[in-house]
């Protein structure tokens, strides 16, 4: 897997010529190559804005919890939600994580579904463990995940995504 990291010129050090244009571009094959000032945004409990294409062909933006493992982005959703079908129809997504302490410090990750895991199928316990892990990351509460709809037998889907491109901006 290889992707491009595009570092935008920013105003953290004051005004500069060509600010807000892409400065350095580099090829990368792992998130380990990401500058730590952006990598930390992935590890903090920052709510991402997930961009997908809805059934009407327009972008749909959803605030949701962010997770990744190794060099894959993990996107979970309940199987009955429209978002699940929209992702199946168009597996390309974009995640935006903005530093809540400085909105001029962010990372954008474009990614595409590589595989879909279903909680109710063999291997589905991984989906449940991921949901429990992200629950603890964002709430500080121990498992199990505490937001399942009690009125239905809610089952979850996990989209495991490969990274296509990353854009970064600013400093903490």
Spans of model-derived segments:
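Short secondary-structure boundary segments
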Residues: 99-100, 163
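Short secondary-structure boundary/capping segments
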Residues: 39, 65, 85, 149-151
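Short, conserved active-site entrance elements at the starts or edges of catalytic domains
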Residues: 20-52
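Alpha-helix boundary recognition
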Residues: 42-43, 88-89, 152
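Charged, gly/pro-rich active-site loop segments
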Residues: 1-33, 105-172
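Short beta-strand segments
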Residues: 45-79, 85-87, 94-98, 106-109
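A short, polar/charged loop/turn motif at coil->beta-strand junctions and beta-hairpin connectors
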Residues: 41-44, 103, 155
């Amino acid at each position: 897997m290889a992707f491009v990291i595009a570092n935008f010129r920013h105003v953290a050090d004051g005004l500069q010529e060509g600010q807000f244009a892409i400065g350095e571009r580099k090829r990368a094959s792992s998130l380990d190559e990401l500058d730590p000032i952006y990598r930390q945004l992935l590890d903090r409990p920052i709510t991402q804005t997930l961009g997908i294409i809805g059934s009407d062909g327009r972008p749909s933006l959803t605030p949701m919890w962010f997770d990744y493992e190794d060099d894959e982005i993990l996107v979970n959703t309940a199987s009955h939600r429209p978002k699940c079908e929209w992702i199946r129809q168009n597996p390309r997504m974009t995640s935006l994580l903005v530093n809540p302490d400085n909105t001029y410090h962010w990372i954008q990750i474009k990614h595409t579904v590589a595989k879909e895991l279903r909680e109710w199928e063999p291997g589905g316990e991984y989906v449940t463990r991921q949901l429990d892990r992200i629950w603890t990351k964002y709430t500080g509460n121990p498992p199990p995940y505490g937001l399942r709809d009690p009125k239905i037998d809610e089952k979850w889907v996990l989209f495991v995504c490969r990274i296509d491109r990353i854009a970064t901006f600013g400093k903490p």
